[in-house]
Design a protein with these regions (language model features):
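Serine-esterase "nucleophile elbow" of acetyl-processing enzymes
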Residues: 1-41, 45-46, 53-63
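Structural recognition of the beta-strand scaffold that forms the well-ordered cores
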Residues: 3-5, 35-39, 65-70, 101-106, ...
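Oxyanion-hole/transition-state-stabilizing segment in secreted/luminal serine hydrolases
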Residues: 16-19, 45-86, 110-111
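Generic structural signal for well-ordered alpha-helices
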Residues: 52, 89-93, 125
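Glycine-rich phosphate-binding loop signature in dinucleotide/nucleotide-binding domains
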Residues: 58-64, 98-100, 182
Length: 182
């Protein structure tokens, strides 16, 4: 089995040393699974689509392949509306579904709700959650796990959008709840 993760800097593990991002922590916890991390700092959802298409250009559908898609924060920070981000993510999921099973990751909160942008992120996440349920995709709710920890007073962010080591560890635990059941 392989789990291929596509996303932005949060998928890559920005702001922590290599090995401490959520994908690498999952990889270390599941030795029998092959992980690939295609997280790119600053990536837009259109960039994710481009990367996904390039990656999949020589691949056929594989029932033992799971493709995790998580992106959108950079688009929101650049002023994109929730419907635009959602529609692009649906397109990414459609492309991914041609190569394997789809897992949707819901982006973590924008800490401090910079200029009300967290509200846009919540709208995208809710639409994605509903979409994932209707398509039968697994959904990893990274938003809630970090939001709840933040509400309890835990320091889980290194900045406005990037988790710190504790935040990435919580994200890994949440992902493993899904990944270990595949």
């Amino acid at each position: 089995m392989e789990i291929i993760c596509f996303g932005d800097s949060i998928t890559r593990g920005y702001d922590v040393r290599f090995g401490l991002g959520w994908v690498e922590l999952c990889d270390a916890s599941m030795e029998q699974v092959q992980f690939e991390n295609h997280g790119v700092d600053g990536l837009s959802v259109q960039g994710l689509i481009n990367n996904l298409e390039y990656w999949g250009s020589d691949k056929k559908y594989d029932d033992t392949r799971y493709i995790c898609i998580m992106c959108g924060t950079n688009d929101i920070l650049q002023g994109r509306h929730s419907q635009y981000v959602y529609e692009k993510l649906v397109k990414a999921c459609t492309i991914a579904a041609e190569k394997g099973h789809v897992i949707i990751g819901l982006e973590p909160q924008i800490d401090g709700d910079m200029d009300g942008l967290n509200t846009v992120l919540v709208e995208v996440n809710e639409k994605l959650r509903h979409y994932g349920m209707t398509k039968g995709y697994s959904v990893v709710d990274f938003y809630s796990v970090l939001h709840d920890a933040d509400d309890m007073g835990q320091i889980v962010f290194a900045g406005e959008v990037h988790p710190n080591e504790r935040g990435y560890r919580l994200m890994a635990y949440k992902a493993l709840e899904i990944f270990t059941r595949l």
